[in-house]
């Protein structure tokens, strides 16, 4: 997908996440917070933040795969962290 199309698909996929999962993704990628900081915000352990982050990314990937082909690197760049 082109970057603009991927961005739109990502926004749609983000809307399908629960508020908590959206918050984890937003804090991690948009606010560039560390998992330990997010744990403090949410009042949970770092391990739980890691689980939520993994779940959110899995759900985003699943949703995006329903929308068509996408490039993992392109997605990482769009989210703001090249992982």
Q: Which residues fall in each region the model found?
A:
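Acidic, proline/glycine-rich intrinsically disordered inter-domain spacer in sigma factors
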Residues: 1-12
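Glycine-centered secondary-structure boundary/capping sites
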Residues: 9, 32, 65-68
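DNA-recognition helix of helix-turn-helix
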Residues: 14, 21, 36-66
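Residue-level signal for the short linker/turn that defines the boundary of a DNA-recognition helix
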Residues: 19, 32-33
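A short pre-motif secondary-structure segment
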Residues: 24-25
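Short amphipathic helical patch at the helix-1/turn junction of helix-turn-helix
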Residues: 28-30
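Short linear sequence elements within intrinsically disordered, low-complexity coil regions
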Residues: 33-34, 75
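C-terminal edge and immediately downstream basic/flexible tail or linker adjoining helix-turn-helix-like DNA-binding
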Residues: 57-83
